């Protein structure tokens, strides 16, 4: 059960609360899905499990894109409350609460957080779609909404920004992400223009991974107070390219 209330005109407040609930559900879908990249799986229950929550330290540097057969299932309290006095570094529920904190906090409302919300909504739509092509397209749109400015060639800007945001600092890593993103986005254009494009599962997983990592990187930089607006993000990426 999600209970959300907003002040103001009753009808407008109701619509705002409905939209807030949808976005929170999308964020839970996002968090639940990306947990597989951290070598564990989040299982959300509809009954009380707080007495059986299992703590786990998470290393955010050791990511995995491959499917794992030995996933560990952990029960997680998704109440986003402060009721449990557990060290935030050892409780996985608290860790993801920390990760998504800026998106759920109205006091940090700005253009960059709006981009994050939109991108997570597209990620969630991709998870809920049963069509590979549609899921792929939704992720591509999420990448566009997060990392393009609309000023120059979308493919070039999107590929560069993805590479400088999520790749390692060495040239080869950035070139790999850049070239991969260019190839993926070419397929997005083919789908959008009615071309006979058939997306493979590995291509969907790749662009979905890029979108997830882009979202996480930006949230981490907001948390570290390195960027606080879309203008800051653009400046950061430009400095990475030309600094």
Positions of predicted regions on the chain:
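Generic hydrophobic alpha-helical scaffold/packing signal
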Residues: 127, 143-144, 163
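Polyanionic, low-complexity intrinsically disordered segments
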Residues: 117, 131-134, 150-164, 169-190, ...
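Charged, non-catalytic interaction/linker regions at domain boundaries
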Residues: 1-134, 204, 212-218, 222-243
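Short, hydrophobic/aromatic alpha-helical segments in well-folded domains
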Residues: 122-125, 138, 180, 187
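Hydrophobic alpha-helical packing segments in soluble, helical-rich domains
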Residues: 136-151
């Amino acid at each position: 059960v999600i209970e959300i209330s907003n002040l103001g005109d009753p009808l407008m407040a109701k619509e705002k609360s409905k939209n807030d609930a949808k976005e929170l559900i999308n964020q839970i879908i996002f968090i639940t899905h990306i947990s597989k990249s951290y070598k564990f799986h989040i299982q959300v229950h509809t009954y009380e499990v707080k007495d059986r929550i299992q703590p786990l330290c998470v290393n955010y540097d050791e990511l995995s894109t491959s499917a794992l057969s030995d996933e560990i299932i952990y029960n997680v309290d998704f109440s986003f409350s402060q009721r449990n006095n557990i060290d935030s570094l050892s409780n996985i529920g608290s860790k993801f609460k920390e990760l998504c904190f800026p998106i759920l906090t109205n006091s940090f409302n700005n253009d960059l957080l709006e981009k994050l919300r939109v991108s997570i909504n597209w990620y969630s739509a991709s998870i809920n779609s049963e069509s590979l092509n549609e899921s792929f397209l939704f992720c591509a749109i999420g990448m566009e909404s997060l990392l393009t400015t609309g000023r120059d060639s979308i493919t070039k800007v999107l590929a560069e920004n993805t590479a400088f945001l999520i790749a390692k600092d060495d040239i080869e890593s950035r070139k790999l992400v850049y070239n991969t993103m260019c190839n993926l986005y070419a397929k997005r254009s083919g789908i959008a223009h009615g071309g006979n494009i058939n997306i493979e599962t590995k291509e969907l997983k790749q662009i979905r991974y890029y979108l997830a990592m882009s979202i996480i990187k930006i949230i981490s930089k907001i948390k570290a107070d390195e960027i606080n607006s879309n203008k800051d993000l653009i400046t950061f990426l430009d400095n990475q390219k030309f600094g």
